[in-house]
Amino acid sequence: MGEDSDDSAEADSHRLRDLIENSSDLIGAVAGGAIGLVGGPAGSIGGAAAGVAITKTIRRVGVEVYDRLLVARQQERVGTVLAVALDDAQARAADGEKIRDDGFFDSGEGQRSDAEELLEGVLLQAANAYQERKLRHLGAILPSLAVRPDIPPADGHWLARLADRLTWRQFVVLAIFANPPEERLSLRDIDQDVSGGMGPTGGLRQEVEELGTFGLLGVTNSNGETGPVGSTYDSASGIWGVPMVRWRLTLQGRLLVDVARLADISTTDRESVLNDLLA
């Protein structure tokens, strides 16, 4: 894709500011009022600190996808993710994180860059994300990958697809086991042994099993090493056959937590799901 002309870039910047302002109510709901990018001149939206490459990608792809959508709520969701992405990019740059220079933002003859393709995919997922609490975390994906040259673009697409496929409650479960409350989990396991309980039933049980199937949640072995569900004798029939204190994120699970900033999920949301897990 060719370079933007000054007039085109300015027009897109105005459109980006407008669409973010049109999404302000939803931005406040899912980001807690932490996003502050709509002020100032339209041409400077995102700020120089956000990085030229990522700002151009967000501006160009964001406006294009937004204008394709006909449903107002879908447009608001896309505007919210764009605001989050710009804010995260600016914060990372302010922290001194360097934008990757391995070709992630480079387009070829008749081909878009990996960054543009990934952002379009994330925005189209966001447009249909009826669990709108996920939007803050979908918006984190591009800025995270922009500073992670250790993650190949193909892996980035896989992570984005996983984030789209998971439910909000699965996001929260991953956040819990990013820093598991081991004492509470141990007490739960003792109670289950005494009472002969089987843990929660219904949807939550299935969602946790699915995290194991996806390779995001695993179990520790006798050496304390984390492996996939099925790698130990007691996990052969599924993760619920293993004491909860031994549940751990796999390498892939930790990667998704980092890229989608799931560690930012509130204590209130974690406690609610954790209480259901411990029931």
Positions of PLM-derived features:
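Long, helix-rich, hydrophobic modules that act as membrane-proximal anchors or helical bundle/coiled-coil regulators
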Residues: 120-279
